[in-house]
Amino acid sequence: MNQINIEIAYAFPERYYLKSFQVDEGITVQTAITQSGILSQFPEIDLSTNKIGIFSRPIKLTDVLKEGDRIEIYRPLLADPKEIRRKRAAEQAAAKNKEKGA
């Protein structure tokens, strides 16, 4: 069976894990992730909750890989971006009201 070259990436705030390797043509994303060994290196990765993509495009674990694909495993968000914006806006409004009252 023919082999294809792929990469698997997992990013942290302070560092980046990237591994290049060859897999059999026709392999699925999930099988490649399992074969890469990344799940034993980073036990916090949970394929049922972590989002997965190829070059920033969301994919399914059942998708078949192509030559040169880079599987990206995304960490869960620590906070909801909408909630952070609401909180920041409320804090800024409170600060403006305080300045007007002073």
Curated annotation (Swiss-Prot):
Highest taxon, organism lineage: Bacteria
PANTHER family: UPF0125 PROTEIN RATB
Species in which this protein is naturally found: Haemophilus influenzae (strain PittEE)
Matching Gene3D superfamilies: RnfH-like
UniProt record similarity statement: Belongs to the UPF0125 (RnfH) family.
HAMAP family in the cross-refs: UPF0125_RnfH
Gene: rnfH
Protein name in the entry: Protein RnfH
